[in-house]
Curated annotation (Swiss-Prot):
UniProt-listed NCBIfam families: hemC (TIGR00212)
Record field: catalytic activity: 4 porphobilinogen + H2O = hydroxymethylbilane + 4 NH4(+)
Comment on bound cofactor: Binds 1 dipyrromethane group covalently.
Organism field: Vibrio campbellii (strain ATCC BAA-1116)
GO cellular component assignments: cytoplasm
Entries under HAMAP family matching the protein: Porphobil_deam (MF_00260)
Gene3D superfamilies: Periplasmic binding protein-like II, Porphobilinogen deaminase, C-terminal domain
Protein name: Porphobilinogen deaminase
Cysteine disulfide partners in this protein: none
Protein function: Tetrapolymerization of the monopyrrole PBG into the hydroxymethylbilane pre-uroporphyrinogen in several discrete steps.
Lineage: Bacteria, Pseudomonadati, Pseudomonadota, Gammaproteobacteria, Vibrionales
GO molecular function, one term: hydroxymethylbilane synthase activity
Gene transcribed to yield this protein: hemC
Subunit relationships: Monomer.
Required co-factors: dipyrromethane
Length: 312
């Protein structure tokens, strides 16, 4: 790659994916005036298989694989991901090299009739495709009917507006980025619904031997966000977490100290194993591993073993 070669960003075609790609393009060009950046749009399996729950068709990696193949084959230089959709493992030669500043990590309650979860009547229908959200909702309100909800943000809002659901739960970050914040009736605090690993953060994946690109991406990295997400992902990696499993986690920084909360649960909310850990940010990944092992010892291993057996 020469200095004048355009940087090619592989991206899905959904509005949110395109927002993220343009966000990185703009940030790169702001940091390096005159740099040429192109978007290479593509369709992934996750965009095609919309009639089946994610947990049954292989999880969130479905949204990433085609982008990774494009990078490995030299058709693209980098891919931009919503961190909550990034699998724990990367193909050889690729890596997560940059994590941008985190947007709001909370879940959002969206409804045309009700202001929050507490206002929902008995047996109300709530839409989500996330086992993590389902598990925490069912623990708090066992009477609620959880109905599968797939598609991009606009599709999901359309289904709500068509009357298929009393409410839906979406990531607040996505609604804010698409300038749809007015659709949010209330935010669900982490104390009530722990977010997904890395929720609200945008990550950049590229070939780890592309030294020119690594240098260009350096100004986009947000160290506070990177430390928090590394902590959450280390926990998830130790749990071997994927889309098939209700895992929530959220870390906060206070100076150089990091506080990580996490949970593993049964999809029906009948059992949730929770834990938390505090330590120095330099030990972010070790803390994530330690908390994961504590969760496993306290009952998460049994939940995970059962869930993975069900999906084989």
């Amino acid at each position: 790659m020469t200095q004048s070669t355009p940087i090619r960003i592989a991206t899905r075609k959904s509005p949110l994916a395109l927002w993220q790609a343009h966000f990185v393009k703009d940030a790169l060009q702001a940091a390096h005036p005159g740099l040429e950046v192109e978007l290479v749009t593509m369709v992934t399996k996750g965009d095609i298989i919309l009639d089946t729950p994610l947990a049954k068709v292989g999880g969130k990696g479905l949204f990433v694989k085609e982008l990774e193949v494009a990078m490995l084959e030299g058709r693209a230089d980098l891919a931009v991901h919503s961190m909550k959709d990034v699998p724990v493992d990367f193909p050889e030669g690729l890596g997560l090299v940059t994590i941008c500043e985190r947007e709001d990590p909370r879940d959002a309650f969206v409804s045309n009739t009700y202001n929050n979860i507490d206002e929902l009547p008995q047996g109300a229908v709530v839409g989500t495709c996330s086992l993590r959200r389902q598990c925490q909702l069912k623990e708090y309100r066992p009477d609620l009917v959880i109905k599968e909800l797939r598609g991009n943000v606009g599709t999901r809002l359309g289904k709500l507006d068509a009357g298929e659901y009393d409410a839906i739960i979406l990531a607040a970050a996505g609604l804010k980025r698409l300038e749809l914040e007015e659709r949010i009736r209330s935010f669900i605090e982490p104390e009530q619904s722990l977010p997904a690993v890395g929720q609200g953060a945008v990550g950049i994946e590229c070939r780890v031997d592309d030294e020119r690109l690594l240098k260009l991406l350096e100004p986009l990295n947000h160290q506070d966000t990177a430390d928090r997400v590394r902590c959450e992902r280390a926990m998830n990696l130790t749990l071997e977490g994927g889309c098939q499993v209700p895992i929530g986690s959220y870390s906060l920084l206070d100076g150089d100290n990091i506080w990580l909360r996490a949970l593993v649960g049964e999809p029906d909310g009948s059992l949730i194993v929770r834990g938390e850990i505090r330590g120095h940010r330099n030990d972010a990944e070790a803390l994530g591993v330690q908390l994961a092992n504590e969760l496993l010892e306290n009952g998460a291993r049994d939940i995970l073993t059962k869930l993975y057996a069900d999906h084989e």
